[in-house]
């Protein structure tokens, strides 16, 4: 069995985690600003991209109804050797209606055994979970039935709670544990994880985990909600974070793929926020105790992002396909009928120091309409790794005069002056791609600065129509640019450099090449 767990990752393919369960695990609709999330909805943000989460959990389903409605058949037909199936039922098996009810120790256990055995027959790896706790700080005889109610929070309906969390699941918690022991299956005690969390937070603070929504603040539940079963975004993210650590312990083969980020941005509702700017706003000002990590899940985020000076030490990490884009350009009119200007056209502005970005695409999609900046970097000690900068004229604006920037294995494309500005910047092992004739760089290095632009081990490439490209022209008289051990494509003119029509610039600039090919 242990060998099976680890062999799942020997093949060069993505491993899928299939999830089956009820509403506490399920993905939720996002209409009306719905704040409800199952913990499975957000689980993908805690794994690297070697792991794909496919959540089939459904609201209101028990182990019985999940089988009877054909939902299990859909899942098991998709399972391939080495895939995982996460199994969590209980809340609705407790219901009295015959379409859902099962008995612990008999029919409930039998259904769990079926899930396990059929998963193994397909070469998959089952993992059993018991039910998350209900937030029940009172002797509530209707706690089980209230799962389905999602009660409005109207006057006089607020529950009176005690101080001790009271169990509502009974023997249904033991069935997954017993079947796991019987069949040698990994078991995650989610009830204990969530019970300890809710009890530790207490009756008032624990409401922050569940769907306790004031009246009139959410279009999805305009009358508010008093719900002690279903999780909100914060609750789902908190509980998934605790659970994934337990998963790593019980299923060691998954441990290397577990990731924790302070915030997650996702278009599909699987994160804390839908936009990158919301995540930036959430970062504490001048946080000095450590870096704030933000995962941007796959998706196209059309927005203008500003990272102000107070949001220091942010790490912005993208999944493959995480694209930040906008289409402003210098001559475009703003709301006052004025031209936006080159600086005003940028998709992203970085003013804070110690910014780090990895695997993010910064794009200005305006096209060939003149100056249109994808990324404007002013903060000191900015580090970009494996990022892409897409645009045409003025793609990357290295703006800060005292800013030091490092571009590591990045891709930067454009036409005219598509890397430009005052900053000191090192480009290492980057691909610099020309989309047409023009100039790769236009530095405006201040007089007295020791360095301007340094390119080391970079590859300069171009489209077929790019035939006449200069390495640089000086935006200011003391411009500096050096290319070392770079691969200069045939599109680079032998003369290399352009003086921007000013012969006197040749007396003050510092342009150099060393051992390029």
Task: Name the predicted role of every residue range.
Residues 1-7:
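Bacterial N-terminal signal peptides
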Residues 261-517:
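Sequence-level preference for short, compositionally simple segments enriched
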Residues 16, 83-84, 125, 293, ...:
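Structural motif
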Residues 27-37, 57-66, 95, 99-103:
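Acidic/histidine-rich helix-loop elements
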Residues 20-24, 55-61, 87-92, 129-133, ...:
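Active-site-proximal beta-strand/loop segments in catalytic clefts of secreted hydrolases
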Residues 10-57, 73-85:
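Serine-esterase "nucleophile elbow" of acetyl-processing enzymes
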Residues 13-26, 30-31, 258-272, 282:
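N-terminal module-boundary/linker segments of secreted carbohydrate-active enzymes
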């Amino acid at each position: 069995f242990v060998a099976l767990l680890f062999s799942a990752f020997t093949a060069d393919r993505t491993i899928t985690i299939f999830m089956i369960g009820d509403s506490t695990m399920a993905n939720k609709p996002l209409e009306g600003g719905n704040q409800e999330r199952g913990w499975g909805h957000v689980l993908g943000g805690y794994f690297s991209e070697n792991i794909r989460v496919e959540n089939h959990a459904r609201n209101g389903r028990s182990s019985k109804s999940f089988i009877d409605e054909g939902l299990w058949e859909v899942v098991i037909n998709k399972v391939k050797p080495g895939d995982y199936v996460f199994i969590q039922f209980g809340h609705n098996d407790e219901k009295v209606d015959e379409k859902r009810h099962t008995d612990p120790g008999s029919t409930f256990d039998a259904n769990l055994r079926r899930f396990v055995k059929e998963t193994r027959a397909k070469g998959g790896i089952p993992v059993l979970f018991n039910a998350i706790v209900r937030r029940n700080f009172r002797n509530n005889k209707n706690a089980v039935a209230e799962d389905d109610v999602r009660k409005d929070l109207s006057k006089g309906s607020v529950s009176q709670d005690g101080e001790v969390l009271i169990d509502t699941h009974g023997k249904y918690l033991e069935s997954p544990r017993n079947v796991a022991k019987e069949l040698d299956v990994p078991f995650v005690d989610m009830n204990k994880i969530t019970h300890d969390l809710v009890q530790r937070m207490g009756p008032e603070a624990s409401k922050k985990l569940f769907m306790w929504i004031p009246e009139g603040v959410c279009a999805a539940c305009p009358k508010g909600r008093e719900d002690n079963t279903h999780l909100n975004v914060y609750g789902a993210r908190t509980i998934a974070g605790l659970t994934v650590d337990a998963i790593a312990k019980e299923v060691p083969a998954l441990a290397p793929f577990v990731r924790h980020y302070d915030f997650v941005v996702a278009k599909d509702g699987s994160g804390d926020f839908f936009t990158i700017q919301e995540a930036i706003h959430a970062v504490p000002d001048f946080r000095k105790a450590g870096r704030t990590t933000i995962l941007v899940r796959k998706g196209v985020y059309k927005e203008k992002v500003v990272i102000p000076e107070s949001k220091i030490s942010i790490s912005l990490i993208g999944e493959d396909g995480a694209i930040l884009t906008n289409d402003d350009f210098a001559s475009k009119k703003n709301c006052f009928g004025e031209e936006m200007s080159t600086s005003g056209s940028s998709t992203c502005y970085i003013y804070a120091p110690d910014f780090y970005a990895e695997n993010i695409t910064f794009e200005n999609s305006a096209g060939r309409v003149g100056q249109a900046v994808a990324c404007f970097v002013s903060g000191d000690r900015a580090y970009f790794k494996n990022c892409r900068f897409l645009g045409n004229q003025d793609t990357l604006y290295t703006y800060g005069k005292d800013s030091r920037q490092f571009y590591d294995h990045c891709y930067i494309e454009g036409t005219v002056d598509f890397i430009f500005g005052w900053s000191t910047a090192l480009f290492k092992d980057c691909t610099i791609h020309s989309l047409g004739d023009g100039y790769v760089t236009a530095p405006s290095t201040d007089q007295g600065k020791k360095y301007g632009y340094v390119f080391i081990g970079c590859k300069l490439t171009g489209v077929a129509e790019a035939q006449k490209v200069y390495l640089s022209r000086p935006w200011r008289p003391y411009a500096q640019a050096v290319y070392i051990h770079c691969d200069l494509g045939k599109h680079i003119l032998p003369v290399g450099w352009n003086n921007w029509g000013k012969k006197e610039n040749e007396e003050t600039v510092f342009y150099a090449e060393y051992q390029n090919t």
